[in-house]
Amino acid sequence: VLVVGGGMVGAETADFLAEQGHEVSVIEMRDAIGPDVIHEHRIFLMEAFEKYGIEQITSAAVSAIFSDGVSYKNAADKSDETIYEARGFDTVVLSMGFSSRYTHRDGQNVVYDFADELKDIVPEVHVVGDAVRARRALDATKEAYDVALKL
């Protein structure tokens, strides 16, 4: 499983999936996994990454998403135009802090449905949390849990 996004949600998702027996890799644009996680919790989370052998790819700006992985550039060195790939995964989980819909693109007010675009390249798309609609955290967490059990 490749988890795209190594913030709090992505890191915890990776931990959960690894705990369930999946081989997991996480790709993150920033230079560390879980920089937004509370320090004390991050210690335990990174111990879990070590325990389960979760691969960490950092400083990686994803440029394309495929059904089996992603291509990316070096986010730490803007002069490096090399395109790298992380491919061969059976599942790609997006946890990029990205709304599935937004209303501003290239200076224009538009409605863009990212989930619909993904349906052309992957067999399943599950939109969860506030990307569906704003609501109580408990409801969104339950919804994400139900989807994670299906993976």
Regions found by a protein language model. Give the residues of each.
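A glycine-rich phosphate-binding loop feature that marks nucleotide/adenosyl-phosphate handling sites
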Residues: V1, G7, S63-I65
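C-terminal non-catalytic scaffold/interaction domains in large multidomain proteins
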Residues: V1-V3, E85-A86
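Hydrophobic Val/Ile/Leu positions in short beta-strands of Rossmann-like dinucleotide-binding domains
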Residues: V3-V4, V26
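A conserved FAD-binding loop/helix module that cradles the flavin
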Residues: G6-F16, A32-H41, Y102-H104, V110-D113, ...
